[in-house]
Amino acid sequence: KQDEKFFGHYSLFGDDSLDKNLKKFGFVKEDITDVFLTHLHFDHCGGAIEWNDDQSGYRPTFKNAQFWTNENHWKWATEPNPREKASFLKENILPMQESGQLNFLPTPTTGNYGFAPDLKMDVIFVDGHTEKQMLPVLQYQEKTIVFAADLIPTAGHIPQVYVMGYDT
């Protein structure tokens, strides 16, 4: 959907693809029923939308899926501030709504939102990397897994405990 210059800066390396990776596990794109969008920056939601067959417009990549975000973040993405405007590309966002596949999670003023209790999944809403980013919290095999996305993109972004010591 973007031009050659864009992909000169932001493109995948190698011959891996979504279709190949889904096939490895016995799935195709039509099997996907839900897409949880941590936030709507192009590098997190761009793959959710693709060209239609004659490249005259766009369509959801996952035609049988519901797309999940929250209304506060949607408003932030569709009416962006100057700093984030380049990260919210309308061609990656608006087709979700136009297709009728977009859903908004309620945004609680305190605490988490129980998104899928049967999957043991909650959602934490944070302001930091972007307004009302959603972090999925999963309970799995007696462990808690939080996908922090760009809020904490690498282990290097977590401050280390440091106790100063020296000899006198």
Where are these regions (language model features)?
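Active-site metal-binding loops of divalent metal-dependent hydrolases
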Residues: 1, 40, 72-73, 128-130, ...
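Short acidic/His/Gly/Ser-rich catalytic and metal-binding motifs that mark active-site loops
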Residues: 1-2, 76-78, 155-159
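Cap/insert and terminal regions of metallo-dependent hydrolase folds
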Residues: 9-20, 133, 137-168
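Metallo-beta-lactamase
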Residues: 10-27, 31-43, 61-125
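Residue-level marker for buried hydrophobic side chains located in beta-strands
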Residues: 36, 67, 145-147
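Metal-dependent catalytic neighborhoods of phosphoester/phosphodiester hydrolases
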Residues: 46-57
